[in-house]
């Protein structure tokens, strides 16, 4: 039966792709125009198309609420790279079968591919009863004993109970509320049900975006996102991917069951390649669509180029950001094979609690205060701009607050005087400002830095990587090494030179290839070239969020004690926080000349000025009142001497 293209798309189950369509009634345009704005617009009756995908071409956004001072706002296109963050509003329209859910919602192995629903009534299974309103997580769609089933799970008392539901399972299934925050790209790829709109709340917007903000000023409200789709496919005798708008006025017939799809190009995306088993590599492929903005030699990934894909694997990268006061900051993924060398640069700490996290057993943390703090209690130390401290460990101490004894968490330090040291207790709730004093002049390769020091860590390239033509890291004023992450890569080479290989990231490099043949392995070793990859703000945000979610975040810094709190509550809170804080070695008193470098005993103004120069080198643009005050302090000290 012939359908309009729009009707076909509406009824399409994405799990059944690819599909083969025959044009029943074509559309013709005068002249020789076969493509407009990147989309096919001319087909002849009888032509056959293999549909390989349905992608969102653009998003139309509509503001739901009336904005004071604004006229009625028309729907507008929201760019795919819009750097906003959104919270999803649960769809109030129920799904009536599990089959309807799987046909319209993305379910997959990704972190984002596990949607949650609840049912209006109890669901009685063989060994389990799913209660009314209980959250059901959908994990995957699998074939079990010849029947397609949805693998589900419920969580009860910190235990997960798994079960399967058939596609025929009926009832009213509603989306659960979702408290997570998403980028527009994540919503487009995973969270917009097919044939439905998606209501979201805008929660944040990056002011680093250099395009015009499409929203009214200070808008943080509710939007309806409407996807505009495009069909992707291939045709016989053509070596490119065609794109068709569903609104194209043609009639089609699905002939998948009666047509040999092998007549068409067998196209694979980077994600498809990574899903292949390791035993299927190496393979020879032809590049059909090349990635945009790739940093590999231009001759390798060009349409029509034959390449070898040797293997897939996970590789380690160091996520780093440029240190600078103005935006936008640049972000990089640095391979551990990077051959340049780094020197340490001073870190900045906004609170005493940050000092507690940053201290290490390897060496004493030496800092200079950039902000004054007046202690309200005799037992706790006040801080002046320019004061220097050696940080030891966290403790608890009792203070009197309006006659009531209260326990507070403190950081035990030693204040550095001209020729001696003085014990100091800094409350962890102290919102001060500190800059690290660096005495280590050694040059480190990145692998040694990550082994010896705790991230995040500030560095500057001191010796560029001479094995690459242009070292982008060498031009940066300074870098903060933030996290060690693991990412997915394919190892590829030019077919004409299979021993010189390059790593390409699966998630950030979109490429389409045609499978040509298998490749016979040679015993000859690979020369693997890894590149420093510059990533976008959105990619950086997603990496930080996902990597950080894998480990428990550190406890929040203790709050300033309030008089209204009871003694019991304070003691309990102090005990809890003391347990949560990282353990550190006991404070010990050492001779002054052994605490620091031999030539730095006494800490005259030269050391401090040297530290200040490090900061100036790292960020010349900065105009920091605290740093200026330190410089004045150093100047006065020198004058007095």
Curated annotation (Swiss-Prot):
Pfam families: CABIT (PF12736)
Transmembrane segments: none
Residue numbers carrying Phosphoserine: 584
InterPro entries per UniProt: CABIT_dom (IPR025946), THEMIS (IPR039671)
Keywords on record: Adaptive immunity, Cytoplasm, Developmental protein, Immunity, Nucleus, Phosphoprotein
Subcellular location field: Cytoplasm; Nucleus
Post-translational modification: Phosphorylated on Tyr residues quickly after TCR stimulation.
Domain of life per record: Eukaryota
Keyword Protein biosynthesis set for record: no
Region annotation CABIT 2: where it falls in the sequence: 260-518
Region of interest called CABIT 1, as start-end residue ranges on this chain: 1-259
GO biological process: adaptive immune response; negative T cell selection; positive T cell selection; T cell receptor signaling pathway
Keyword Transit peptide: no
A GO CC term attached to the entry: nucleus
Disordered: region residues: 614-641
Function: Plays a central role in late thymocyte development by controlling both positive and negative T-cell selection. Required to sustain and/or integrate signals required for proper lineage commitment and maturation of T-cells. Regulates T-cell development through T-cell antigen receptor (TCR) signaling and in particular through the regulation of calcium influx and phosphorylation of Erk.
PANTHER family according to UniProt: CABIT DOMAIN-CONTAINING PROTEIN (PTHR15215), PROTEIN THEMIS (PTHR15215:SF1)
Similarity field: Belongs to the themis family.
Assembly behavior: Interacts with PLCG1, ITK, GRB2, and LAT.
Name of the protein: Protein THEMIS
Organism of origin: Homo sapiens
Gene designation: THEMIS
């Amino acid at each position: 039966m012939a359908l309009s293209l729009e009707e076909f798309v509406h009824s399409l189950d994405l799990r059944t792709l690819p599909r083969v369509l025959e044009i029943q009634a074509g559309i013709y345009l005068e002249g020789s125009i076969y493509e407009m704005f990147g989309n096919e617009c001319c087909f002849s009756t009888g032509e056959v198309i293999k549909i390989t995908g349905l992608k969102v071409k653009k998003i139309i956004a509509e503001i739901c609420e009336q904005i004071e001072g604004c006229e009625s706002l028309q729907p507008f296109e929201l760019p795919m790279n819009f750097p906003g963050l959104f919270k999803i509003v649960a769809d109030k329209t129920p799904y009536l079968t599990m089959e309807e859910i799987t046909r319209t919602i993305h379910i997959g192995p990704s972190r984002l591919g596990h949607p949650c629903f609840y049912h209006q009534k109890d669901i009685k299974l063989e060994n389990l009863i799913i209660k009314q309103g209980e959250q059901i997580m959908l994990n995957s769609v699998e074939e079990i004993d010849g029947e397609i089933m949805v693998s589900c799970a419920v969580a009860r008392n910190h235990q997960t109970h798994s079960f399967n539901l058939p596609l025929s399972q009926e009832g009213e299934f509603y989306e659960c509320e979702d408290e997570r925050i998403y980028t527009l790209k994540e919503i487009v790829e995973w969270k917009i049900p097919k044939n439905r709109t998606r209501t979201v709340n805008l929660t944040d917007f990056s002011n680093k975006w250099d395009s015009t903000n499409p929203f009214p000023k200070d808008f943080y409200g509710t939007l309806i996102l409407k996807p505009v789709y495009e069909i992707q496919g291939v045709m016989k005798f053509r070596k490119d991917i065609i794109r068709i708008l569903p609104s194209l006025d043609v009639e089609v017939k699905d002939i998948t069951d009666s047509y040999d799809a092998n007549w068409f190009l067998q196209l694979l995306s980077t994600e498809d390649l990574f899903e292949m088993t390791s035993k299927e590599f190496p393979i020879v492929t032809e590049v059909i669509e090349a990635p945009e903005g790739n940093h590999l030699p231009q001759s390798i990934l060009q349409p029509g180029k034959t390449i070898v894909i040797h293997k897939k694997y996970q590789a380690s990268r160091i996520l780093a950001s440029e240190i600078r006061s103005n935006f936008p900051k640049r972000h990089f993924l640095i391979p551990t094979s990077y051959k340049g060398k780094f020197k340490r640069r001073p870190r900045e700490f906004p609170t005493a609690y940050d000092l507690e996290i940053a201290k290490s057993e390897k060496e004493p943390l030496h800092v200079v205060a950039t902000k004054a703090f007046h202690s309200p209690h005799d037992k706790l130390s006040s801080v002046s701009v320019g004061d220097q401290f050696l940080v030891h460990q966290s403790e608890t101490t009792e203070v009197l607050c309006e006659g009531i004894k209260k326990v507070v968490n403190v950081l035990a330090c030693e204040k550095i005087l001209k020729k001696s040291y003085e014990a100091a207790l800094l409350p962890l709730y102290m919102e001060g400002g500190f800059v690290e004093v660096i005495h280590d002049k050694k040059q480190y390769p990145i692998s040694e830095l990550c082994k010896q020091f705790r991230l995040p860590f500030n560095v500057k390239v001191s010796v560029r990587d001479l094995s690459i033509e242009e070292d982008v890291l060498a031009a940066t004023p300074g870098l903060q090494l933030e996290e060690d992450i693991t990412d997915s890569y394919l190892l590829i080479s030019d077919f004409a030179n299979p021993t010189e290989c390059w790593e390409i990231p699966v998630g950030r490099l979109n490429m389409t290839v045609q499978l040509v043949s298998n490749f016979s392995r040679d015993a000859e070793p690979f020369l693997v070239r890894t590149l420093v990859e510059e990533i976008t703000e959105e990619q950086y945000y997603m990496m930080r969020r996902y990597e950080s979610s894998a480990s428990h975040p550190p406890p929040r810094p203790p709050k300033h004690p309030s008089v209204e709190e009871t003694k019991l509550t304070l003691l309990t809170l102090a005990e809890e926080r003391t347990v949560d804080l990282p353990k550190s070695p006991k404070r010990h008193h050492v001779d002054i000349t052994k605490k620091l470098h031999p030539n730095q005993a006494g800490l005259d103004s030269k050391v401090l000025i040297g530290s200040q120069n490090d900061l100036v080198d790292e960020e010349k643009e900065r105009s920091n009142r605290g740093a200026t005050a330190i410089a004045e302090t150093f100047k006065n000290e020198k004058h007095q001497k």
